[in-house]
Amino acid sequence: MKTTNDFPTINERPPEGRKDDGSSFRVLVVDDSMFVAKQLGQILSSEGYEIVATAADGKEGVDKYKELCPNVDLVTMDNTMPKMDGITALEQIMAIDKNAKVVMVSALGKEELVKKSLMTGAKSYIIKPLDRKKVLERIAKVLQ
């Protein structure tokens, strides 16, 4: 005999880091700061996101995106990195996949840099230091 507890509630939905089918959103984290990459990874994985790879510079990030595409749902991208900056990496990722979902994560919050990132194809911009609530809200909104 079924009880009312056997049925999902109307407001029941998957955790933020999971798709409707229950699988995890897959994230590529690109940041030259190992501390920030680890912190971002912990925030996201604690909510069900799967960190599929990390990269320490823009060139490595683009290479990993090419390797993993289409199995990446989201890229987080720092702006200031060695070898290749975040805007250049963003341009290259958008050339590979015009539907790529990239969120810039940077200590630089200058208005012109934010605008350039968004005009280049970034879906959102998060300013460091990382605030757990803001990170999760922005990323969830991009993945809706």
Give the location of each predicted region.
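Non-catalytic signal-transmission and effector/linker regions of two-component phosphorelay proteins
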Residues: M1-R26, K133-Q144
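Two-component/phosphorelay signaling modules centered on CheY-like receiver
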Residues: M34-A53
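Acidic catalytic/metal-coordinating carboxylates
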Residues: D57-E60, D85-T88
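Active-site beta3 strand of CheY-like receiver
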Residues: C69-T76
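Receiver (REC) domain active-site loop signature in two-component systems and cognate sites
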Residues: M81
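Alpha4 helix (beta4-alpha4-beta5 surface) of REC/receiver domains from two-component response regulators
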Residues: T88, G109-S124
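A Lys-centered signature of the CheY-like receiver
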Residues: K128
